Amino acid sequence: MTGLGFDHPWALLLLPLALLPFLVSPLRLSGVPSAEVAPEDTLSRAVGAGIVALGALAIVLLVLGLSGLHRRDHVVERTGVGANIVLLIDRSSSMDSTFANRRPDGAEESKSVAARRLLTDFAARRPADRVAVAAFSTAPMLVIPMTDKHDAVRAAIGAIDRPGLAHTDVGRGLSLAFSMFDETSTETSRAIVLVSDGAAVIDRRVQDALRAAAARDPVRLYWLFLRTAGARGITDRPPPGDPDSPQTYPERHLDIFFKTLGLPYRSFEARSAGEVSDAIREIDQLEQRPTLYSETIPRQDLDWLCYWAAAGALLLLLAAKLSERRLEDWEGEALLPSPLRGGVGGGGGAGEGATRIVASRRRALHSAPPPTLALPRKGGGNAPDVHSQQPDSGRAAS
Amino acid sequence: MSPAPARDGPPRFDLPYRLFGRARGVATGGHKALGQGANGAFLRHASLLEQPDARRIDMRASLLDPFGGLKVRRFEHRARIDVFVVLDLSGSMSFRRDGQGEDPVADLCAAIAHAAIRSHDRFGLIAAGPEPLAELGVRATARRGVPDELWRRLSAEPGAGRGSRGLLAAVEELPQRRALVFVVSDFLMPQAEIEDLLGALWRHDVAPVVVRSSAVEAPPPRFGLLETRDLETGRRRLLVMRPSLREKWIAHARARRAALDESFRRFGRPAFDLVDRFDADAFADHLLTGGA
Amino acid sequence: MRRPDWRTVALGAALALGVVAALQPETEAERPTYDVVAFVDITGSMNARDYRDASGRPQSRLEAVKTRLSTAVGRLPCGSKMGLGVFTERRVFLLFEPMDICRNYGAIAGAIAGLDWRMGWEGDSRVASAVFAALDMLAPMNADIVFLTDGQEAPPMRTDMPLEYSGDKDKVKGLLVGVGGTELVPIPKHDDFGRETGFYAMEDVPQASRLGPPPTGAENLPGYNARNAPFGEMPAGEEHLTSVRESYLGDLGRMTGLGYARLDQPDALAQAIAANARPRPVPVAVDLSPLPAAAALLALVALYGVPPLARLGRRRAPTHASRSFN
């Protein structure tokens, strides 16, 4: 399903760096005697939290971007019109000759080349199909499991004109084909398309197995018989008197066997590439059923999104930083009147001499000794005296 | 007499501080004290029999006495007091006291020391942050060099630490005798702590000095973001400066100051506001009108 | 205006770098891709169990090939193509032509998982002939070969008739991959229904080649009979046991211009394929955005990280300075 992935998950180890903004502020701080000097303010608190969050967010986003955040390619289930098809292709060496049973030359293509060409078209026309490819000859071979990757189907069909093997073991090929439907293929849309240019006797045990498989997994069966000139056809009956045995008329008996399976079955006998094409078109028209198929949405890189978001956060942070104010640049404004100077004072009565000192200005204040000064000891408070005591003052005081 | 040369801080002046109530103590000084003395303000007349001091016979009063008794003049006793500064040196006090510019606290303390010693009182200082700072303290002394020395030491000691609990412990060292105690602090502590401190000083005449800075009481008027850091706790706060917040801020500061005033009045005197810089005239005015 | 705070500069730099990263600068680079067809030996000797799976249980050579090959091709760079074929007897059978690995990995992995020794159409195992046939097949397809086999010729090769390769050594590149252990192990035997019925014994398999005319001097071999036993009697041998024939595969590789590697972990196999197949450079866009993004992150970390570090340093240094007076 939809999931996020990382190209470099180890970069996520840098995520704890996002704690830094909680500890440090990008703004220059102004020391104040106490946090309580400023009143509570909701807006300020929100903005403060916002600045912390922006810093953390910017770091988180950059780290996410660096770790290559992406949305994984994911598979979307879609319903379409098509089928789940197993292409069961004969790869016996007789497929390498032409319909006229000759070595292929420039003018005439071999049966396998024609089948390859027409089946490739068939697969390309039907995007909603899920296709599996199996080959059979002496032994059955799974080529591609059920897939909706049409590339893969094309590559598998592309290999069918390679030189084939000796025999044609239809029965085991079919039982492989039955086993290739997976759970995701809806039952009503299952089809097997058997492409062969001949038939063979099916072992009785294999026949039983096929009957059991047909009863278990009902599929529609198409047999595209590429009839070579001079070979027997599906409908050819033996002339009276000839033994009518599977050994002598394998095609006819295979057809009969298919009919006894109790499956929706059709056979097409094609004597030329044109007839193959017609048959395939007919199968195409018949196999139009609602199917569930999956489409892969390729991965989407999200790092650019992270970077843009980080840049946005940084822009806001920069704006905050640029509107930074500091108490250090501010001398203050004596707006607050001193309560005493506001005329509150006067609690204690003025002592004697008080009026005189109040009247005097600074100069008078420091030049006049207190009027009630008792007799000075040791020569009074001369300034030179004060300084002469300095050298030992520290020791004395501590 | 000329002021001391301003080598260690600004020029210092005498300050008209006074002790509320009468001082106790035998050492002669400049403050009204309990008891009678030989000098100073006239107190009453006494009989020569009661006070056989022939030098102070008030002839006029003796003549006017209908009983003809000899009257001797009695004077108030004037005693020396101890002037103490209890200085809060917690982290919050380091605001704008980085040793570069003016240091109003050092100026104030040195001025008090100077004035006290000049007035033949003894000066002492107790400093504390979260812990008592014994090495900064000054025992009650009348030594002349103390103001300058103190100024230099305080200028170099901006204050550090969280809370001013140390003050409460440190004030135990104050003398038992009633003294004039200037409590110098920004009082940016919980109200209960302030009252504990003032309560512990019940014995003394307490004159609070509130160290304030107008920069933090009225923030800059421009729009912008201001992030403050509590010098004590290190707590950060972001503030979106705008006119409405500025008004709230100023009102907040006013309210805090008013609450402080309330406490101070309950414990005696109103406080002196040491705003931004030490203004000796203002301090003198304060002492004359509201304080000692 | 005063000189801006360095933090403003750091923020501005981070912003600018973030925008640059968001614009996704790209550069063109070439990435090697590979176009290979893997042929898997599905002869009987591949059923010998001398590998161990992830949980340590014995695993047949074919199963080991299936798990490791599909992992290894997943490690090839995107854009690489892979086809698949099987080999028994003296020929190879192409299941599908090369297709894009990244886009069709599921189908490829499914096809590899579907490989089975029962696909084999004959019991013989003429490795050299099959390699030659595979090379012939691939030459027009312009694909390289990965031939996974244990190198066991059955029946054995004639020792007196040297092997020769007449094709062009440079037409197809690639490698032979030796599958199996170096210890001799028995080969499981199956009956007509594919059930395992034990192991091959010495008498079950020819221990020496009987193909072609008898060698000169065969008259002197024990059991020689001109009509019934022109090669002499079947010698005793170890052809019913199997191990990977590394030296033989190495010789075969040198003869055909192919490399040789032992089947090991998938990464090693992917590396071996990359080393031996012809790289086909395809232009790919290389995203340069991590560079500015990393620089932006660095600027942010400096913005947030330097002040506390500086504070830490300051706290450590001046313990004497604050109390210098006393």
Describe the function of each predicted region.
Chain C
Residues 151-244:
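VWA/integrin I-like adhesion module and closely mimicked acidic/polar interface patches used
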